[in-house]
From Swiss-Prot:
The G.violaceus PSI reaction center is composed of one copy each of PsaA,B,C,D,E,F,L,M and Z, and forms trimeric complexes. It holds the Pfam family PsaL. It comes from the Bacteria. Disulfide bonds: none annotated. InterPro entries: PSI_PsaL (IPR003757), PSI_PsaL_sf (IPR036592), PSI_suXI (IPR022980). It comes from Gloeobacter violaceus (strain ATCC 29082 / PCC 7421). Keywords: Cell inner membrane, Cell membrane, Membrane, Photosynthesis, Photosystem I, Transmembrane, Transmembrane helix. One of its GO terms (biological process) is photosynthesis. This is Photosystem I reaction center subunit XI. GO terms for cellular component: photosystem I reaction center; plasma membrane.
Length: 147
């Protein structure tokens, strides 16, 4: 899957979306190496990697900016909220896979289902990993300061 297929067309009536930012070699390399665009990956592995990243970074805003941020349960509430959002996102991915008629040729319905399953497993795993890091950070920090 190449970026140019989506942003460039030779027909001047349709226009071109190529800019120095999205057409540079570094940006193309970055976009081509994102898990959704990487060639040769299994759908479950692709979803697992995407889910881990989302679960890992979603817990922070929920835990630190949520309504329970100043309580003892702020981090747990952030974890539960993150898992809830990941479940909603997985339901959305599964709904897309089963309801849309024109699925891209890279994924069939089974591939989208496997991607959604990997997204959920990876997302929950990433959220639990981030929760553990945030929960035990004071302990690790105290151990590191011991002379």
């Amino acid at each position: 899957m190449t970026l140019a297929r989506y942003v460039y067309t030779p027909d001047p009536q349709e226009g071109t979306l190529l800019t120095p930012v999205n057409n540079s070699t570094a940006i193309r390399w970055f976009i081509d190496n994102l898990p959704i665009n990487r060639v040769g990956m299994d759908e479950f592995t692709r979803g697992l990697e995407i889910g881990m990243a989302h679960g890992y970074w979603l817990i922070g805003p929920f835990a630190l900016l949520g309504p329970l941020r100043n309580t003892e349960l702020g981090l747990v509430a952030g974890l539960v909220s993150t898992i809830g959002l990941l479940l909603i996102s997985t339901i959305g991915l599964s709904g897309y896979a089963s309801l849309v008629e024109d699925v891209p040729t890279e994924f069939d319905r089974k591939g989208w289902s496997r991607l959604a399953g990997g997204f959920l497993v990876g997302g929950v795993g990433g959220a639990i990993f981030a929760f553990a890091i945030l929960q035990f950070f004071p302990l690790v920090s105290a151990i590191a300061r011991i002379p």
